[in-house]
Design a protein with these regions (language model features):
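Conserved glycine-rich cofactor-binding loop
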Residues: 17-18
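N-terminal Rossmann-fold NAD(P) dinucleotide-binding loop
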Residues: 21-22
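Conserved glycine-rich Rossmann-like NAD(P)H-binding loop of the short-chain dehydrogenase/reductase
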Residues: 31-47
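Rossmann-fold cofactor-recognition segment
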Residues: 53-70
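A glycine-rich helix->loop->beta "capping" turn
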Residues: 58-59, 77-91, 97-102, 133
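Catalytic loop of short-chain dehydrogenase/reductase
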Residues: 94, 98-102, 108, 130, ...
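C-terminal helical subdomain
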Residues: 218-259, 266, 274, 278
Length: 287
């Protein structure tokens, strides 16, 4: 009996329609999981597994630009109205961008999408997680976090410098893992396990998409990096594998890894918490 068969339930996956998120969705659908997909764009139209799951309602789709608080709030409200429970939450949406970009709220896009939004989704779906059996959150981080040499939480919203992959992207992933570490004891007291995990190097190149990868990395990725199912497996194991009872840990290659700049974890958590309580709470209000 596989892990999935033992723990079959309902998983919510952000960024479920491409790359690692798509492979995680396909893996879990094949094992009989119910999947809630929170995505910005559509699934591939030629994927028979996905199409069949949509028709049978094993896969239920909610669409929003996650970096737009008004759209995100609307989608999360719909999920809370329509869904009964969430056993596993995979905060997986994100990516590396080719330049400094900003969200509708005015913050740097890597930080908004990959640090702030996972916190918002986790907070907003706590009630559904409490109704689930597994009550587990996995935040998709990156080993790029370990390359950060200087870290200042005050510059995350409006960085003054940009470097592909190793700049705001890496800082946003480090910040994600830091607040995950800091929040974990509070959630564990409520019965919810949260941890962050690096899905490893995967060939996630998409034709026609301008990525934030350094030019030299693209041919290396194409030739040598494994299929995104590799990363999906690592995220799956982060939720259900041997570390499933450990709150707050950061996993690289399924190994617990010490975070750099852990002294800033409370400050990062305070920042994302303030954005959630002040800005997100007011999103979508008239006047």
């Amino acid at each position: 009996m596989t892990i999935g068969q033992q723990h079959r339930g309902t998983a919510l996956i952000t960024g479920a329609n491409n790359g690692i998120g798509l492979e995680l969705t396909r893996k879990m659908l094949a094992e009989g999981w119910q999947i809630i997909a929170l995505i910005r764009s559509s699934f591939p139209s030629d994927d028979s597994l996905v199409s069949g799951a949509v028709k049978s309602k094993q896969l239920r789709i909610y669409k929003a630009d996650l970096s737009d608080f008004t759209a995100l709030k609307r989608a999360l409200n719909e999920i809370r109205l329509q869904e009964q429970q969430v056993d596993l939450l995979f905060n997986n949406a994100g990516g590396s961008f080719p330049e400094l970009l900003y969200s509708k709220q005015g913050r740097e896009l890597h930080y908004e999408l990959q640090t702030v939004v996972p916190y918002i989704i986790t907070m907003e779906l706590q009630a559904l997680l409490q109704k689930g059996q597994l009550k587990t959150v996995v935040n998709t981080s990156s080993n790029a976090a370990m390359t950060v040499r200087h870290f200042d939480p005050e510059t995350l919203e409006h960085p003054t410098k940009f470097k592909k992959l190793l700049g705001p992207y890496a800082a946003s992933k480090l910040a994600l893992s830091l607040w995950t570490r800091e929040l974990a004891p509070q959630l564990a007291a409520a019965g919810i396990m949260i941890r962050s995990a690096d899905p490893g190097a995967n060939n996630t190149l998409r034709s026609g998409k301008d990525s934030g990868l350094p030019f030299w990395l693209k041919p290396v990725m194409k030739l040598f990096f494994p299929h995104p199912s590799h990363g999906a497996g690592l995220l799956y194991n982060a939720a259900l594998g041997r570390h499933s009872k450990l709150p707050g840990v950061f996993l690289i290659k399924d190994q617990v890894t010490e975070l750099k700049f852990a002294e800033y974890s409370s400050k990062v958590l305070s920042k994302v918490q303030a954005i959630y309580e002040q800005e997100f709470a007011a999103a979508g209000r008239l006047g």
